Amino acid sequence: MMNTTCYRLVVCEKPSVARSIAAVLGAGRREDGFLSGGGYLVSWCFGHLAELSDADAYDEKFGKWRREDLPILPDSWQYTVARDKQKQMNTLRTLMHREDVCEVINACDAGREGELIFRTAYNLNNCRKRVKRLWISSMEDAAILQGFDNLRDGAEYDNLYASALCRSKADWLVGINATRLFSVMYHRTLNVGRVVSPTLALLVQREAEINAFQPESFYTVHLDFNGFSAAGERMKEQAEAERLAGDCNCKTAAVTSVVQTEKTEKAPALYDLTTLQRDANRLLGYTAQQTLDYLQSLYEKKLCTYPRTDSRYLTDDMEGGVNALALCCAGICGTEPPAAVCSGQVCSSKKVSDHHAVVPTMAAGETDLETLPAGEREILRLVSRQVLMAVSAPFVYLETEARLDCGGNAFAAKGKTILHMGWRAYTEKGKQDSTLPELSEGQSLPVSSCAVKEGKTTPPKHFTEDTLLSAMETAGKEDMPEDAERKGLGTPATRAAVIEKLVATGFAERRKAKKSVRLVPTEAGVSLITVLPEQLQSPLLTAEWEHRLKEIECGELGADEFLAGICDMVAALVRDAAPVDGAEVLFPSGRPVVGKCPRCGAEVTESKNGYFCERRSCKFGLWRDNRFLAAKKISLTKKMASSLLTQGRAYASGIYSEKTGKTYDAFIVLEDDGARSSYKLDFTK
């Protein structure tokens, strides 16, 4: 009798997620590389099981980096499976081709990268079975069950996969070609990336602005009254400010106007990943990568919703649960929920793309927070506090602006009276009044004291991870269409990795300041941006690429058209790139210096085959063993090369005579006509 059992194969992104899903599905039997039970086989990847192969997989000659081999533009793409992941790839292949597996469910992360991870494994294993997609924003049991009750057709995500594949290929094309090109041009490994390089350019530009800044002094006259003070306009000259202060001292000032305005500050929206990373850096000192790691762990523990989101709202159908969510968050924070929960202001399906905002799950409210690692606990509380603020009423205050006249000179004073704390009840900032006394137009006030205060203009601030993430998010925004769905450098899911790569490759470093940790470019980072052409460091161009990837995802742009544009750009880059003058100063070789070049004055350094000018546009060199030296059976030593460059000649002993077969001593003299160098012998002492 034939076996009619039909299994559904569930492929997850990592083992921990597979275990959670398997537990919900009743697949509790452990097998080699998968779990089974309840009609399901639940297996996993280890992130990317296979990635685009390196260039030498296409041709052995690409094993050496040569400019003449560029650009490298594969006609068909090859993949390499990491050795430590081959066994799991084989397991997936076996499972996908089992006759009793009738359907494959993609349960990798519900996003661009998760789609790529699954499709790569599916395609490389030549699987042709029907695919369903699990798309969930929470790892709670109820959310998983609901997701399996509402599986989507895998074909609905073909455009998402196309976008992910284009991103991967674009990164390869730019990274492989540009890294090889500039490494060969400047004789050292220079890692160039589609997103990494323009992000580094932001750091370098800011550093240049800070270094070029010249502080300027300014002076302000302050009048003190009973209970408040007023300030005049800024003045450039101290003497002028001192004269004004002298005129006002011990006089009276007249109130010329009093204007009161009621102002409202709306509650902030919920967190998306980038906004959470920014606040976690500013308030807790966490790096973007640390925040993502903590949030990912909370997600896998079913305590937070999906982390890699770019939305700050919930969907409309979630509005009914906002009151319970607020109560849960209040418990996590050890406080009270708002008196009136404004659930409508956090729900808007129109503003949610793939995933809603990051919020705690209801399970988080039932968890003993002390059992969590400190980092996860602080992030969970930060997310919970944001929910409480987001569902609160506005912050309302009365702003009073008084204008005064003293001796014909204008002064101003401002005060603020809080009318309703609203969402600011959950934050320390803005809780204090700064009120002015009751003032009326025409009122005369005695000046109790008068002082001149000096200030200085301040330079732009160094980037922190908070402000760099903001700059990455908004890069190119002003030059792109208002309706563009994705702007900026990278995505919420990739920005942390970009920052970490800059630090890991030595192009940027974290530098502690009094109240923050700055991100600054290293000398190597500044040098790299100095020699890179505009198209590789332009945030606008990279933001435009991100926008086009989003168009591919939405089915508005073809993948072939996008990649053709990338290939054209890479080919033009290889064709047109030329070394920057003075690059030898930016990228010193580190080789021993033997003297100065007689042609251009740059340093001559020792290398394997001789002694050559560091300036690459200059062709001067002294070979260790040219025809002349080989015939004399001598080799040019470092000491001899130094003597040739400083004195024009070098003493040599044991010179072989082809005529007599004997040896003799003489001076070797350097002759250089600006185009070629040669040697001759000199027997004078």
Regions found by a protein language model. Give the residues of each.
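Amphipathic alpha-helical transducer elements in NTP-driven molecular machines
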Residues: 15-22, 39-42, 46, 82-93, ...
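Feature marking long nucleic-acid-engaging regions of large polymerase/nuclease enzymes
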Residues: 101-104, 120-133, 190, 194, ...
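C-terminal or mid-to-C-terminal helical accessory/interaction module adjacent to the motor/catalytic core
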Residues: 143-225, 260-264
